[in-house]
Amino acid sequence: MSAEDLFTIQILCDQIELKLASIVINSNIKLQLKRKKKTQQL
């Protein structure tokens, strides 16, 4: 394992974390929108 390999792995891990974070944020927003629609219907 060279330093370049470790650096590449670090970048990939960061990208995966960002993708996971954006997925979580998007799903949270969708849940909030669904709740708003339900409360508006009542």
From Swiss-Prot:
GO cellular component: chromatin; cytoplasm; nucleus; Pi Mi complex
Chief location bin: cytoplasm
Any one GO biological process: positive regulation of meiotic cell cycle
Superkingdom of source: Eukaryota
Compartments it resides in: Cytoplasm; Nucleus
Keyword annotations from UniProtKB, A to Z: Cytoplasm, Nucleus
Role: Mating type proteins are sequence specific DNA-binding proteins that act as master switches in yeast differentiation by controlling gene expression in a cell type-specific fashion. Required for meiosis, but plays no role in conjugation.
Leftover remarks: There are three genetic loci for mating type genes in S.pombe, mat1, mat2-P and mat3-M. Cell type is determined by the alternate allele present in mat1, either P (plus) in a h+ or M (minus) in a h- cell. Mat2-P and mat3-M serve as donor of information that is transposed to mat1 during a switch of mating type.
Name of the featured protein: Mating-type M-specific polypeptide Mi
Organism: Schizosaccharomyces pombe (strain 972 / ATCC 24843) (Fission yeast)
